[in-house]
Amino acid sequence: MQEIQFTLTREFIPLCDLLKATGVADSGGMGKVLVADGQVKVDGQVELRKTCKIRENQIVELGDVRIHVLPIDANEA
């Protein structure tokens, strides 16, 4: 399984934007399709809301990819 660590730059990121930002989806539109198809899990549960707010310490899974969402870097805030 591929593990990706993503550090937030603000309080949350919409799910479809996270998929695009991590390169899991080629575009925001593709991210929305993946979510709508029920292929994405957030903290182990299928998530169908395309703009679900993903916050620190959540885990997003798509196929064999797992994204760990890290808190905002205090040095950059």
Task: Place the predicted regions along the sequence by residue.
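Intrinsic disorder/low-complexity signal
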Residues: 2, 16, 42, 60, ...
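C-terminal structural segments of small proteins and small subunits
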Residues: 49-77
